[in-house]
Every structure is written in C-alpha cells, then in structure tokens.
C-alpha cells in the first residue's frame, strides 16, 4: 500500500470513529494522529493528556504548545496510576495498569461528552512487539488508526516532517517510570529525581539520553547515565562538571554507561505460542508481540 493510500485510509478511519477522543502524549505518533484528526474532524476530536508524576513538565508544556500550533483542542486528565500498587510495584507489565487507568478515565469522559470512540497512537511497527498497553486498549475497545492504516514509524516521521510538525525528528520519550528497573518501586521521589537529573543533562545540550535510576545503595540511589553513541565524546568532555551536578541532586554515585544509549530492537519474533499476543489477543500476520514497555 502506497503512502498516499495509507493517508486516505487513515482519514477515512478517523471519519468513521468521530466524534473521537485521542490519547495524546506529545510523542511522534500521537502528535501526528491528533494533528490529522484535527484537520479531518475539527471540533469533533479532543486530545487527552494523562498528567501524572511520570510525565516530565517539559514534555507536558511541549505537547500543549504543539497542539495549539496545529489547532487541536486538548484536555488534561490527572491520572492516579501511582496510587495503584499493581503499577507502583513496577512489574514487567507496568504499562498495562497505566494505560488501563488512562483509558478508563477517557471512557468516562467520552460518555459525559458524547464521544463515539477512543483512539491511541500505536503504529504498524508496534504490532510486532509485546506492548502491555495494547492489552488495555483491547479491553477498553480503543482503536489504533495509525496501525490499522498500515503506517510505520518511519512513515509517520516522514509525514510529520511534511506537515511541519516539530516532533518529526524527536527522539523516543517514554515515561519517567521507564528509567526505574522492574521490581524497584516507582515513587514520586524517584520520578522527581530522575526528571530533575534529565533536565540537567538536557541543559548541557544532549539530545538522546537516559538517566537510569539504580536501586538504593546506602542512604541514596545511584544513577546510570546513557547518551547516544554520537554524543559520547561530548559526554567525556563534560563529565567532570556534569557528574557533580547530578550527584548534588541526591545520587550517591553516577555511572557512565560505556556502551551509551541503545534504542530497543523492533524485530519480529515468533514463539511456541505463535499467533497469540498477551491475554490471547491475536497479533497481525500471526506474530507474537515483543515486549516494549520500559526498556526504552
């Protein structure tokens, strides 16, 4: 299917599902989806941002600014996933509980506001990974127009660039909870520490990076700093004053990952339960979904 055909398919799907609520994180996919929906549906679409301690303030501000730029209406919903011990205990399917909280709030909003459907930004590449949030979408009947129209991440970036969206070349920005290893509790204090640390790193000009929260050793947690491979040289030059700044925030030790940041793989995988996703949900073309929740 050609790119123009996929665009037409997407716009037809948006018309079919109107009036529509779109889960909007400010990332590449949901930004493009909401921008297209705003063009096609006008006032019959509303973007919904889940606001919680796992969302950096900088990301929230950017999402609101971008939505205003392309003319989409947005509602901020304060979500309470951190109060759910199934989420805060940080299991491997943590993202399921986050998305279930969001989609439940969106469903209530849809009923109150007369919206017909809920949508989110899963794309065609995501269909070949195990994404716990996709199970929540299935349970709450949330549609994925980008995936259904066959649009891949690369195509969405290309179309975003054509539209002039500032997210076209934006690095992946998973929530702050993804910086905390599974099994280590997600707390407000840990999320705030990570957010402050990443603000410092960003202030030094780094573009692709993660500050990984490591389990507490003694009285304070440690951190593992990862930057993109093309920024490793810059990190070595700045480390002598960047590391002390991070330690001053509350880390007992800041390690530099010598391998740098590596994006999670998007390979298609098969297994003995081929054809079934989580919860028995069948994935397109019979592939098992590879997990992509918190490793990015």
Which positions does each model-derived feature cover?
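ATP-dependent adenylation/nucleotidyltransferase module used to activate substrates
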Residues: 1-162, 223, 241-252, 256, ...
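Short, structured loop/turn "capping" segments at alpha-beta junctions
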Residues: 152-153, 157-158, 165-174, 207-209
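Internal, active-site/partner-interface "lid" segment
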Residues: 170-190
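A glycine-rich phosphate-binding loop feature that marks nucleotide/adenosyl-phosphate handling sites
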Residues: 177, 215-218, 261
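Short glycine/threonine-rich loop-to-helix capping motif typified by GTGT followed
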Residues: 184-191, 232-233, 266-272
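Short amphipathic alpha-helix segments
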Residues: 188-209, 240-243
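C-terminal boundary motif of the adenylate-forming
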Residues: 205-215, 257
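A short interface-forming secondary-structure element
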Residues: 215-237
């Amino acid at each position: 299917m050609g790119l123009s055909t996929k665009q037409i398919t997407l716009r037809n799907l948006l018309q079919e599902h109107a009036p529509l609520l779109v889960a909007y994180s400010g990332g590449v996919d949901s930004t493009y989806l909401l921008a297209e929906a705003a063009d096609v549906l006008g006032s019959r679409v509303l973007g919904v941002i889940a606001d919680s301690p796992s969302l950096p303030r900088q990301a929230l501000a950017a999402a609101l600014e971008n939505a205003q730029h392309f003319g989409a209406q947005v509602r901020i919903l304060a979500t309470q996933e951190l109060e759910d011990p199934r989420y805060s205990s940080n299991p491997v399917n943590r993202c399921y509980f986050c998305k279930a909280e969001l989609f439940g709030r969106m469903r209530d909003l849809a009923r109150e506001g007369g919206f017909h459907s809920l949508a989110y930004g899963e794309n065609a590449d995501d269909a070949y990974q195990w994404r716990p949030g996709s199970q929540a979408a299935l349970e709450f009947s949330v549609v994925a127009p980008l995936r259904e129209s066959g649009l891949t991440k690369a195509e969405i970036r290309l179309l975003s660039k054509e539209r002039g969206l500032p997210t076209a070349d934006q690095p992946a920005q998973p929530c702050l909870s993804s910086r905390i290893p599974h099994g280590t509790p997600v707390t407000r204090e840990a999320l705030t520490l990570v957010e402050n640390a990443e603000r410092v790193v960003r202030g030094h000009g780094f573009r692709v990076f993660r500050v990984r929260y490591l389990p507490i050793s003694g009285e304070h947690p440690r951190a593992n700093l990862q930057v993109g491979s093309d920024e490793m040289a810059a990190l070595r030059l700045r480390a002598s004053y960047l590391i002390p700044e991070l330690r001053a925030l509350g880390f007992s030790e800041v390690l530099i990952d010598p391998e740098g940041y590596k994006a999670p793989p998007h390979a298609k995988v098969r297994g003995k339960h081929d054809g079934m996703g989580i919860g028995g949900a069948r994935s397109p073309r019979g592939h098992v979904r590879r997990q992509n929740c918190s490793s990015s």
